[in-house]
């Protein structure tokens, strides 16, 4: 697994896990804001642009990150955060290692498996994968994701770099992930965020995560869509990180 880093001179470690189909730039604005006081690490999940290996599973990504933290930071960091697929990887990390971080942020992570969605992914991408290399098609996708316009070139470049096999693999993994029983043993102070404009499954997932983590805090973000908090409002996100750590 590869990593992008900011603020290497600082001792307190914050690790941020990007969403599926995106990359480290998901958190670039927040990372640049936080780098004065924290060492920010942005892993590039397997199977994504600039990654060093194909995607296998959410569990394997979690193991890689745990091993990285064990090797470089004596088994724990200050805060970890994850959006969507990255949020699922973080939930898996917290399930496997309950004390790996002091604080955690879960943003829009799906934990309501859908066999129907899983079954539809392969035929859907089999017919339209080739279109992602056309800007007109990519712009339609990008617009539907509600990502701020200045990130389009990053999005287009990186989606074109993801193989069909990897894209199907991580989308299928995303559609089937569910919480592990061991998540209840997590000792981190967890904050769960979801946009009010997200679909019902995502809203229900946020509630399920909140209930599974008894000491967690759940916040519904008014008028925001999937991933808008960390992607489109990086400075607000950075301020929330500071607020959480300050608690």
Where are these regions (language model features)?
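Gly/Ala-rich beta-loop-alpha elbow adjacent to hydrolase catalytic centers
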Residues: 82-86, 90
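Conserved alpha/beta-hydrolase "acid-adjacent" motif
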Residues: 199-205
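Active-site loop/oxyanion-hole signature of alpha/beta-hydrolase fold enzymes
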Residues: 41-81
């Amino acid at each position: 697994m590869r990593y992008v880093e900011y603020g290497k001179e600082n001792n307190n470690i914050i690790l941020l896990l990007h969403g599926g189909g995106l990359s480290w730039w998901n958190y670039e604005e927040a990372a640049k804001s936080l780098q004065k006081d924290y060492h920010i690490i942005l892993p590039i999940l397997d199977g994504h642009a600039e990654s060093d290996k194909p995607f296998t599973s959410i569990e394997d990504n979690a193991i890689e990150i745990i091993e990285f933290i064990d090797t470089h930071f004596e088994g724990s960091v200050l805060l970890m955060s994850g959006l969507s697929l990255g949020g699922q990887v973080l939930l898996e990390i917290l399930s496997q290692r309950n004390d790996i971080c002091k604080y955690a942020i879960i943003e829009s992570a799906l934990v309501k498996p859908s066999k129907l969605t899983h079954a539809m992914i392969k035929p859907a991408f089999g017919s339209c994968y080739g279109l992602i290399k056309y800007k007109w098609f990519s712009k339609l996708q990008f617009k539907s994701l509600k990502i701020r316009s200045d990130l389009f070139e990053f999005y287009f470049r990186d989606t074109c770099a993801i193989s069909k096999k990897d894209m199907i693999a991580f989308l299928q993994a995303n559609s089937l992930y569910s919480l592990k029983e061991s998540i209840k043993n997590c000792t981190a102070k967890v904050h769960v965020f979801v946009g009010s404009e997200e679909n019902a499954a995502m809203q229900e997932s946020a509630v399920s995560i909140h209930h599974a983590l008894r000491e967690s805090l759940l916040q519904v973000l008014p008028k925001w869509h999937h991933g808008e908090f960390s992607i489109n409002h990086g400075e607000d996100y950075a301020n929330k990180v500071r607020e959480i750590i300050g608690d």
